[in-house]
Structures are given as C-alpha cells and as structure tokens.
Amino acid sequence: EQKGFLVNKLDGGSQAGNQLGYYMNKSRDDMYAWYITEGEKKGIYGEDCLKSPFVSLPGVSSWSKLFDGKAGERAVDFFRTMGVKIVIVVFDADKICNPMVYKKQEELVEKLQEENFLVGIGNWDPSLGKGIDDLLRAGHKPTYQLRK
C-alpha cells in the first residue's frame, strides 16, 4: 500500500497476456470439425449454434498461439487427440476488403496444412453479418471451401 493505494509489486505489472478461448461440449459437439474465429463471444455463440468445438483467438494476428508449446501439448495437438479431421477458419467477412485479416487467414491455413489438417475457409455474404456470430444470429450458416 502506498498513500492509500494498492501497488502492484511485480516488475511490469500483472500480465495475463493474450489467451486462446476453448469452447466445446464433448457430450454434444461433433468433433469432426473444429472452428477457429476471432473473439471470445463469437466462439461461445458459434459453439452453441453449430454444436462443434470452437477456439477463439484474441486477434487474427495471434494465430500462432495455436502452435505454442511443446509437441503434444499445443492447442492443435489437443484437437487432433479429440478426433478432429477438418479445421474451418471463420474470420470476419471483412477479410475480403481488409488485406491484413486476409493475410493472417492465409498464414494460419498454411500452418494448419503443414500440420496435416484438412482446412476449410468459412464464407458468407457480408450483408448477412460481419462475424460468424452475426451470421448465426440472423439464422444462416457459413459455407466453406476446402483448401488443397
């Protein structure tokens, strides 16, 4: 305590860092496909609507967190052990006009393919909503194209 204020004694403060969000219900979800999106609320809502596991990234630039850690302990390894065969990337629909979002999507797709996952890119008409949550709330589902 300093002059009536609590003071963090850790150098640089308390840092939570950017974390991945995992959303799944093993008793209900179809573990064949795993969805990756940006934003916690999109992951929660997407899993509930599509009945498939979701991982939410804190931002599209943080996709490499899926591959952090030792082999066998990474997020991608966890989903492989759950029986996931295809990964569907559902970044926001503005990827068609936002070069940075598109670039990060393509980097993620390439890395997932290096890990031997089948990869699909979720697409929808942007007029139906920017994010997967908007699309689902409007009563629609994404289509996806498999990447070779």
Model-found features: residue ranges?
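Phosphate-handling DNA/RNA-contact segment within nucleic-acid enzymes
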Residues: 1-83
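Short, small/acidic-rich helices and loops at N termini and domain boundaries
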Residues: 128-148
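Acidic beta-strand-to-loop metal/phosphate-binding motif
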Residues: 34-36, 85-99
